[in-house]
Regions:
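N-terminal "arm"/small-domain region of PLP-dependent enzymes with the aminotransferase-like
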Residues: 1-64
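Conserved N-terminal alpha-helix of the aminotransferase class I/II PLP-enzyme fold
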Residues: 46-89
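Conserved beta-loop-alpha segment that forms the PLP phosphate-binding cup at the N-terminus of a helix
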Residues: 81-104, 120
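Conserved PLP-anchoring active-site segment centered on the Schiff-base-forming lysine
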Residues: 101-117
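Active-site phosphate-binding strand-loop segment of PLP-dependent enzymes
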Residues: 139-200
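Active-site PLP attachment segment
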Residues: 212-250, 256-267
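Conserved small-domain helix->loop->beta segment predominantly found in fold-type I
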Residues: 282-359, 383-403
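PLP-dependent enzyme catalytic core of the Aspartate aminotransferase-like
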Residues: 349-481
Length: 481
């Protein structure tokens, strides 16, 4: 197929060039009705912010340019079908899981999953079996699930309705999935992979393999995370014979907006085009990787920080992700480092107790040199600050192989109450506790609360982490059943 084509974007552009007069929604009327002080920022994009006009197709019943754009994406990724998502990978996870899982179905789930996976399991009233990721204490980060642990769970629960994996994790760390997928398929179990951070993996080595290349049945990717797509723009890929496509499409129609953003969908068309052009230029990919490697090397040479990576041979890192760790005696935590970098207008993806995570661009046209100078300046200033917090107090993340203490169905029938932290140990959590980003719950709804949970939550609060948990959590309280 001709991957240089951009059917949806081209059609939108042609519509704009005809200088149309809008008597349809949205109410800004191609940008004519808009607050004057904001117009300069929004005017260009509002010109193509239209609705399902003749020739512009319909996301929920595509037959024209949207269908063509999705077909080009499917061709690029080598899958049966690709769907454009306008509600992020969240809706991809929800629709994928609901399409294969029903009430009381057993589902094998990687524990360090996004909250949207857990919301889908709750909506389905499923029975999740959680597999804990391994933890690398040398760099203080989870490195994915052990293949043998997942295969053991499949053999223990051969009638499971799905295996749900997260690969890569938020830090860009991946593991080989083919062994898991092959065993799951031998048991007629579909595999769903949340590959939100890996839309670019089909570029090939040195990037990790994409789950679409290892046979996963449903693969969800946030195009907006690493490709040049607008926020919330994502892809859902389908392949194999285990998926009921009619059921999947029902949930996509039910869960996504009936008024999808045309600029957002056009950006997915353009992101696919960008990736296809890059994939066809191996020399350009090599040059890009060399630039990223050089940036990391120079970053690692800045006093006060170091670039860290897992050393195990069985994991592979995404070249677009960089974990930096504070090493100066006056820089105690990742949160402290993140705040200081922001003083020089360097904005990172996330901080945790140990690291700051940077997401690098899929382009050499980026102010790498200017960024290095700003980071150096921020580090010079932070070296003269003081903090009394001892990072060694932080215990490892409290993941473990587990099932829920009570089922989702039972939760609907039980009353919630709020108790102080000290009274919560041994009780069942009635609300999740979620550091955000990355959106991975420390404590699951329905999980038995332990002292390790509370210690970790308390440490994060002391460090000033952003945690989704409601007002009760701010008052050192938890909701329990």
């Amino acid at each position: 197929m001709d991957q240089s084509q951009t059917p949806l974007f081209t059609k939108l552009q042609a519509h704009y060039l005809r200088k149309p007069i809008s008597f349809h929604v949205p109410g800004h009327k191609n940008g004519r009705v808009f607050p004057e002080k904001l117009g300069s920022l929004f005017s260009a994009i509002l010109n193509i912010d239209v609705t399902e006009l003749r020739g512009l197709d319909d996301l929920h019943d595509p037959e024209g340019v949207i269908a063509e754009s999705q077909y080009l994406a499917a061709n690029l990724y080598g899958v049966n079908k690709t769907y454009f998502l306008v509600n992020g990978s969240t809706v991809g996870n929800l629709a994928s899981i609901l399409s294969v899982v029903s009430q009381d179905d057993i589902v094998i789930v990687q524990r360090d999953c996004h909250k949207s996976v857990l919301n889908a399991l709750k909506m389905a009233n499923a029975r999740p079996i959680f597999i804990a990721p391994e933890y690398d204490g040398n760099v203080n980060v989870c490195t994915g699930v052990n293949q043998e642990d997942v295969i053991k769970a499949i053999k223990q629960y051969p009638y499971a309705k799905a295996v749900i994996l997260t690969n890569p994790n938020y830090y860009g760390i991946t593991r080989e999935l083919k062994g898991i997928i092959d065993v799951a398929h031998d048991h007629q179990i579909p595999v769903i992979v949340d590959e939100a951070h890996g839309a670019h993996f089909i570029l090939g080595d040195p990037f990790p393999k994409s789950a679409v290349q290892t046979g996963a049945d449903l693969v969800i990717q946030s195009a907006h995370k690493t490709l040049p797509a607008m926020t919330m723009g994502s892809y859902l890929h389908v392949q194999g014979t285990f998926i009921n496509v009619d059921r999947l499409e029902f949930y996509l129609r039910a869960l996504q907006s009936s008024s999808p953003s045309y600029p957002l969908m056009a950006s997915l068309d353009l992101a696919r085009f960008y990736l296809a052009q890059l994939k066809s230029e191996k020399i350009q990919v090599r040059s890009l990787v060399q630039s990223l490697t050089q940036f990391k090397k120079r970053l690692n040479g800045i006093e006060g920080i170091k670039v860290v990576s897992p050393m195990e041979s069985y994991v592979k890192e995404d070249p677009l992700k960089v974990m930096i760790e504070p090493v100066h005696s006056c820089i105690k935590t990742g949160y402290n480092l993140q705040k200081q970098l922001e003083s020089q207008q360097i904005y990172s993806e996330l901080a945790d107790p140990f690291h700051v995570l940077l997401v690098l661009p899929l382009s050499e046209q980026f102010p790498f040199e200017q960024s290095l100078q700003k980071i150096k300046k921020a580090l010079v200033e932070i070296i003269n600050t003081e903090t009394s917090f001892d990072i060694n107090q932080i215990c490892p993340f409290p993941f473990q192989n587990t099932t829920l203490a009570i089922s989702y169905e039972e939760m609907h029938l039980l009353k919630k109450r709020t108790v102080p932290f000290e009274e919560a140990i041994g009780k069942v959590a009635a609300s999740p506790v979620i550091p955000y980003p990355p959106g991975i719950p420390i404590l699951l709804e329905g999980e038995l609360i332990t002292k390790r949970h509370l210690d970790y939550i308390s440490h994060l609060q002391e460090l000033g982490a952003k945690i989704q948990g409601g007002q009760a959590l701010s008052n050192q309280q938890l909701e329990v059943f």
